[in-house]
Amino acid sequence: MWKKLPSPGWLAFGTVVTVAGSGIAYDKYEQSQIRSLYVNHVRNEMSSSLSTNVKPRKLLVLVAPPPNDYLDTSLKLWRRWIKPILHSSGLDYEIVSGTKQGEIRTEIASRVRQLRKELIEQEQQQQHDAQSKKSRSWLDWFKWCRGVSTTPDPVSEESPAASFDTRSVLGIFYHNEPQPVVTEDSLLDPSVAGGVICVGRGAYKEYIAGVHEGILGPLEEPPKVVESDASSVTDTTASAVITENPSVKEISVTQPAETAVAAATVGTTMNETGAVNTDSTPAETIPAETTPTENTPIETTPDESSEEKEGPKISKPYILPSDYANASIPAELSKPLIIDPKTGAPAFFEQPLLVVAVPNLSGFTTIPTRIARFYQKRFLCEQVSHSTLAIVEAKSRPFTTTDLDLSAYEELDWPKSWVESGKERGSEWVQPLQGDDRVLQKFRVVEPAIVPSLQLKEDQSKKQELSPENK
């Protein structure tokens, strides 16, 4: 034991460390309690089992990093407070993340365009089947008049390869007949089927822009405007110089695959008949390095592996927000309810939408606010867990124009220098979010206020237990 108290410096140091550590430990403990409360509630409420041929309800999760930060910042919020609740509820999910601006918008727009193509093919197939059925009915009538049997023979029409099933040979369906696999979303009410979670204000902006681009934009990419100067420059290259070199002529005849590369390297131009245009430029003016030989390495285009390393391709918007009013809703999406032909569930943009803000401050002047938030993460945990419970229970309402400002307070944390530079280069995130009423009326948004807070209930029950009236 100490014979005397430590010095005032050590006492101050011990007090600061104890208070700081106690605050962190208390906040971590409260976070774990809140997470356990929601996880246990969801596990008990979603304890019903599904049939073996039914796939569970599936959510689409879009994750974008905060400005001037890494993607792991948003993924931490997802892994800590959203994923455990979805895992305990038994719901399936698909994550789409983007590290660059435009990746999520490009992915969402391509999915909407793919859905439109599938709907068009489905409608064409239905028309073709109806036409063939009509023509077949007349053919059967003529056969019936002649006394020919019109009943098809299933044994003769069905091929042995089509009727063979390995599972039947193994005896899997000996006691139970095979059943078609369906999704739970196709069996539920359209207002509670599926769901979309946008983690971050940036992901929400790209989701709205991507849906509008896919619905109001064209199916194919608009043609790019090519400047005429580029073609004139290539036509004026000194291509006739190579005509005096017999090696080039030999390559152009025997190796057509290398001719294009060699011609692009030295700047040769070919006419429609395959002959090389001639000029008065002497052959001695070309350096020896430009003449393609067997020892000269030929430049090739980057392979697919290098493209995969660069990341997904980000395409420019097929339609700008200023052109939304002039565009029309396509005929395949004009129905009140759009059903995905593959899953039988409503289209993902008609499913309930939840937006989760990712507060993230940076900079030296924001250190006091960052410290205060660090010791109060339990409140953010409660907010995110409560919102996740709302989408699990599918508590939603129709989308309104004011919902375009969901999680708009997150933009207050964005660095001002980043916002200013984004405005200069035309960044998508710093632009005001615009929407078309014809598209927005297809959306549904999750309303957490409909679901009572479990943490609030827990606090009220504890107060009632500690009140003097209950003692």
Swiss-Prot record:
Q: Does the keyword Membrane apply?
A: yes
- Identify the domain of life: Eukaryota
> Keyword Transmembrane helix, does the record have it?
yes
InterPro entries cross-referenced by the UniProt entry: Lipid_Phosphate_FormReg, Mt_import_IM_translocase_Tim54
Q: Which residues lie on this side of the membrane: Mitochondrial intermembrane?
A: 26-471
Which residues point to the Mitochondrial matrix side? 1-8
Q: Where in the cell is it found?
A: Mitochondrion inner membrane
Provide the topology term for how it sits in the membrane.
Single-pass membrane protein
Residue ranges spanning the membrane: these are 9-25
Q: Where is this region: Disordered?
A: 272-317
Cite a single Pfam family from the UniProt record.
Tim54
For bias type Low complexity, the affected ranges are 281-300
Of the GO CC terms on this record, one is: mitochondrial inner membrane
Q: Which GO terms describe its biological process?
A: protein transport
Its keywords, alphabetically, are: Membrane, Mitochondrion, Mitochondrion inner membrane, Protein transport, Translocation, Transmembrane, Transmembrane helix, Transport
Q: What functional role does this protein have?
A: Essential component of the TIM22 complex, a complex that mediates the import and insertion of multi-pass transmembrane proteins into the mitochondrial inner membrane. The TIM22 complex forms a twin-pore translocase that uses the membrane potential as external driving force.
Note the subunit structure: Component of the TIM22 complex, whose core is composed of TIM22 and TIM54, associated with the 70 kDa heterohexamer composed of TIM9 and TIM10 (or TIM8 and TIM13).
Instruction: Give the family, as the similarity comment puts it.
Output: Belongs to the TIM54 family.
Protein name per Swiss-Prot or TrEMBL: Mitochondrial import inner membrane translocase subunit TIM54
Q: Which organism is it from?
A: Kluyveromyces lactis (strain ATCC 8585 / CBS 2359 / DSM 70799 / NBRC 1267 / NRRL Y-1140 / WM37)
